[in-house]
UniProtKB/Swiss-Prot annotation:
This is Cadmium resistance transcriptional regulatory protein CadC homolog. One of its GO terms (biological process) is response to cadmium ion. It comes from the Bacteria. Residues 23-118 form the HTH arsR-type domain. SUPFAM superfamilies: Winged helix' DNA-binding domain.
């Protein structure tokens, strides 16, 4: 038996029932899609720089992540389709930004958490 497992089986029915009831009202699959999109380090880099700069054109993003504009566009389009980013067109340029403050906070908190974990270990 390992230290990180219960040695006996005991179900806390009140907590389990409450959690199941609340979980049934949520949409974990859609939330999982957000985390799946952000599980790619290139897309995390893009989300991070958008949280810093507010808005960047596709060419700038491509330069920052050291890729072609086609590759940057692919990642940005995926982020847009999942509600993480939005875009606007100005003349011949397309500018992307994070969809809203919640997304920005999610990205910032993830980086903060990573720094805290790194400082402990």
């Amino acid at each position: 038996m390992t230290k990180d497992m219960c040695e006996v089986t005991y179900i806390h029915e009140d907590k389990v029932n409450r959690a199941k009831k609340d979980l049934a009202k949520q949409n974990p699959m859609d939330v999982a899609k957000v985390f799946k999109a952000l599980s790619d380090d290139t897309r995390v880099k893009i989300a991070y720089v958008l949280s810093l700069e507010g808005e960047l054109c596709v060419c700038d993003v491509a330069n920052i992540i050291e890729s072609s504009t086609a590759t940057a566009s692919h990642h940005l389009r995926l982020l847009k389709n999942l509600g993480i980013a939005k875009y606007r067109k100005e003349g011949k340029l397309v500018y992307y930004s994070l969809d809203d403050e919640h997304v920005k906070q999610l990205v910032e908190k993830a980086f903060l958490h990573q720094r805290e974990v790194a400082s402990i270990g």
